[in-house]
């Protein structure tokens, strides 16, 4: 891309400094060396993996002591638990024996499922947002925030009407930080989700398409206008706030560091042949892959979209005309643009018309010799039913779309392969 760098100690930098005006074709990435994962035995991933998180390095650069940084995590986690009913905890991950049998895998292979459905706000999304909140709060604690008091805080902003909005509003409520949530017209948004957003004190802004809007999601347009006006991008899109790519890696670290089922905790670790990860905006897949890569593991990554909206798969194919997936970022406009028209799917949480974090996802698939998978709707529906029937996990069709990708290409896999998926969000 443009080659700009940002020092880890620079406060409140969310985007590439060269992403000015309407030029959104920029993306920051976290630069960190591969290192053996040696988490502590704390059951909170933001404490267990704290020394690997970029926010911790940032807070240390501001002069906060190790004890102060740990205290910030514990305090915020307690506040989140008071609102959500749970704080951040390492989530279950293991072989789904009945599901593996149903899909014809041998005892040596099978499907391992990471269950995020009982996490904060019922999905993985809060993991991404928590490191943004940690960045904000540590900036305040260090006396580096440009606002003088909590009452003068700028509002948070997010464009979402689903799990990300719920996660963002939950974290905002925990610290009494004002938040604006940009949602599609009420006919397109879940009444239950909207009701919960209001309960959490969010300022919900409906965003019908305006005649002057360019292509793309009107909610994202209004969100960006709010950020231009001074709001903090409390977003799960790395192109809007790169700090969301920090906390999301904890999922990959938990999976990459998991011990074999027949070993004592801490003895060895599982190795996987493939990861199937559902993709909407792309940060989730980028983070899971980054977590594995930093741990020194590169199973084949398959980013899964539906045939109703598959801009990432299109970008993958287009990339081979401009030098391949790892060079595609220099040809943004030729590879990634809004998908039109966006169809319908039960997996409505991955119908983003753009895969905003497409560059790291393409690179991760290329590095691991993976490829995108476009799932048909019958596989989307089958996946949700299969997972619930064979594991009891009550995930939404969005949350089981990775399994739908596996179903789509099951006949191409050997029966002894080890496959990992993430049940990323609860059925509502």
What kind of region is each of these model predictions?
Residues 147-155, 165-224, 313-319:
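Active-site-proximal loop->helix
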Residues 126-132, 158-175, 189-192, 245, ...:
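Short glycine/serine/threonine-rich phosphate/pyrophosphate-binding segments
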Residues 221-295, 381-387:
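Active-site/ligand-binding-proximal alpha/beta "capping" segment
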Residues 1-81:
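N-terminal juxtadomain amphipathic helix
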Residues 142-184, 268-284, 301, 419-423:
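A short, small-residue-rich loop immediately preceding and capping a beta-strand
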Residues 404-428:
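Catalytic phosphate/nucleotide-handling subdomain of diverse soluble enzymes
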Residues 209, 213-233, 238, 294-395:
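Active-site/ligand-binding loops adjacent to catalytic centers
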Residues 57-145:
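Positively charged, low-complexity intrinsically disordered leader regions
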